[in-house]
């Protein structure tokens, strides 16, 4: 897992969900651990798309449940 991508995702998640970045770990589930609702999740995906200049299709977004999932997906897209 790329530390650089993880740190950027951690920062974005903390800002979007108004949580302490220290709480944002690779295994953190957006809904169960970080309190995101469905609207938060959509906004988070949009923020990640913008920050990393990628497109995350709805079907892919549905499979991203944790911070680690997001990092892995972004790593894969960025090659």
Swiss-Prot record:
One Pfam family, short name: PP-binding
Location in the cell: Cytoplasm
SMART domains: PKS_PP (SM00823)
Gene Ontology annotations of biological process type: lipid A biosynthetic process
Listed SUPFAM superfamilies: ACP-like
Keyword Lipid biosynthesis: yes
Post-translational modification note: 4'-phosphopantetheine is transferred from CoA to a specific serine of apo-ACP by AcpS. This modification is essential for activity because fatty acids are bound in thioester linkage to the sulfhydryl of the prosthetic group.
Protein name: Acyl carrier protein
Gene that encodes the chain: acpP
């Amino acid at each position: 897992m790329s530390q650089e991508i993880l740190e950027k995702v951690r920062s974005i998640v903390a800002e979007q969900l108004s949580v302490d970045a220290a709480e944002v770990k690779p295994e953190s589930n957006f809904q169960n651990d970080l309190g995101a609702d469905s609207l938060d999740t959509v906004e988070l995906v949009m923020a990640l798309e913008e920050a990393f200049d990628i497109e995350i299709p709805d079907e892919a977004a549905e499979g991203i449940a944790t911070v680690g999932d997001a990092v892995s997906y972004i790593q894969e897209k960025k090659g």
